[in-house]
Amino acid sequence: MRPLAEFPLAPRNRIRGVLFDIDDTLTTDGRLTAAAYAAMENLHGARLLVIPITGRPAGWCDHIARMWPVDAVVGENGAFYFRYDPAARKMLRRYAAGSEQRAAGRERLAAVRDRILQEVPGCAVAADQNYREADLAIDYCEDVPRLPPEAVAKIVALMQHAGLTAKVSSIHVNGWFGGYDKLTMTRTVMHECFGIDLNARRDEFAFAGDSPNDAPMFAFFPHAVGVANIREFSGQLTASPAYVTQAASGAGFCELVDFLLAAR
């Protein structure tokens, strides 16, 4: 990972949009700061596409799509995208799986949840679980004392043994049935909503993230950026971003936005 200052001017000038994780990338210690929200506003005002790519639940993403200065949101690690059309007063919701498949998946996830809670002391079902459509979120440090890496690894192993795709974020371990991830639904929203083939135009977008569940995005985007706290996951990343900010969390996101807008 190179310092953000080494991101050359010419490719920065070609950036058309910024995609970003929310927890501990946009937020700081669980809070959305005024500066980070203003950074999103500044991107939107500069007519760049602004799209959070998050593990947070459908209930949150409905609010985000409606009320934040964003063009769409990908949620639950790629389970769906939401895009709000204010002129039509209509929310477009696109899921990776149909409603019946999601309902069946939730029943199967309940059994996995119960086993994890029994076998991994100290973990908990994430506080936002009731607002989820497609995945199981196990809290390992958001509202519980931080669990050791061995406990997090056991949660992942139990999910995988049950046939789930499992990803570790900075606060949760998320598990779901299906082969999708953040990148697959990002490709879908870009094609369906904006007519963009990301395979051909990936160099027109920056992605910012901070944890292992962002690895598919780090691997795909040549202009991927980690906020400084990504170093906490060194050795756990299957792919690393090209650049890293000096500042952590939301301040690192602001650093990236200022750096990109200064090139315009």
Briefly describe each language-model feature range.
Residues 68-71, 90-93, 143-144, 185, ...:
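Short, hinge-like loop/turn segments at secondary-structure boundaries
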Residues 20:
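Active-site T/S-Asp motif of two-component receiver
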Residues 112-206, 211-220:
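Conserved acidic, metal-coordinating active-site core of Asp-based
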Residues 31-128:
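Active-site phosphate-binding/coordination module
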